Amino acid sequence: MTRLTFRTTAAAVTATLAVTMLAACSSGGGGGAAHLTWYINPDNGAQATLAKECSAASNGQYNISTNVLPSDASQQRQQLVTRLAAKDDSIDLMSLDPVFVAEFAEAGFLAPIPDSDAAAFTKDIVAPAVQASTWKGKLVTAPFWANTQLLWYRKSVAQQAGLDMTKPVTWAQIIGAAQTAHKTVGVQAKLYEGYTVWINALVEGAGGQIVDNPGAVAKNLKLGLDSAAGTDAAQVIRSVVHDGVGGPSLSSNDEAGSLTLFEKQDTSAFLVNWPYVWAAMGPGGDKVSFRDSDVGFTTYPQTVAGQPSKPPFGGIEIGIGRYGKNKAAAIEATKCITSAEHQKEYMVSSGNPAANDTVYTDPAVEKAFPNGLAAVILQSLRQAAPRPQSQYYGDLSTALQEKFSPPGSVGSGSPAKAQKFILEVLKGDRLL
């Protein structure tokens, strides 16, 4: 994630309100159909396909066109914030990264979801996706697709180490196995959002949380980093570094870099990464020769032995723009887009996991995510933990990354230093 300051939405866009707004997408449909514009994150065209299918199924009620946002999540946010702060009525629907939901809701950029429609958006949805779509007790976005990280491993290395991968394993166990085998554990520790993802999962997995009172204003915000859970998280990071299993590029590794490391058969052992890994290594991807014979997958490692892990949670939620002129049609379109059938279709065509847990036993999904992978993804989603929900998330995440970087500097005092720094930044006493 680009290092931006997100202290308040108003502050982030003050300098941009004078910029001339881009022209709205051209209307596509007639006959009285409401024209809806859906701002989507880049994919392989699967969201655009859903837009066409739902338009056709609406019987002339609405017609959806799509506008593709930048590939970088922070740039997606910036474009949407700039437009919404200017009360752009061309934004009817938007694909939102879960970490921005609180900020958009707090700023009043999201149209309320009527209580009478909330059940349609939450039925059969995994709990973390509902949590990520909720702000101050109200559903403010509709869960669309959900993501989670798995533990990928070399079967031969795990077997040699005597690890039973049908049971939960700990970070300490996989670090020890990799160290003994002189191989690596792939993580994301670059100074970017992926590092926050790792830190948060470690803290949550130790029974803690980074933000203790979501929704609080900056002066009243309470953090849980300076805690036993924070210390446990720091110890895992320290072990990856000082036990020599992080690899030479640890402090610059993102998802792609850590996957590249894992694909080196002679040096790799374990990797935490998203489900796209399986397809990326297979036909049409990197065509890793040992994928089918020696790559296994299971749920995220435990931070503390015996305490269930809290895998990272990601995905996309659908927000309805406050200033759009066709909110009733937007609600109906969102119901169509996020239906179980369309979530299944999207999961198969894009490779992005569904938020609806009923689709995971569908034959088409099991074919696309074979050998029990679909079931492991669902299990991981059910126990996943979203990143901290806060209207100040951007500043919080950037400050956290700074105080935990480089990974080699992390020690028992890092959580307390990070907590102090984050609070100072949010209260305006320090600058990023």
Regions found by a protein language model. Name each.
Residues 298-299, 347-395, 399:
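Long, aromatic- and glycine/proline-rich binding clefts that accommodate carbohydrate-like moieties
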Residues 2-102, 119, 286, 304, ...:
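Conserved N-terminal structural module of periplasmic/extracytoplasmic solute-binding proteins
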Residues 178-179, 218-251, 300:
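Glycine-centered hinge/linker elements that transmit conformational signals in sensory
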Residues 98-148, 202-205, 296-298, 367-368:
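Hinge/lid segment of periplasmic solute-binding proteins
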Residues 159, 242-245, 284-350:
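Extracytoplasmic/periplasmic substrate-recognition and gating elements
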Residues 140-144, 149, 172-226:
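Extracytoplasmic/periplasmic solute-binding protein
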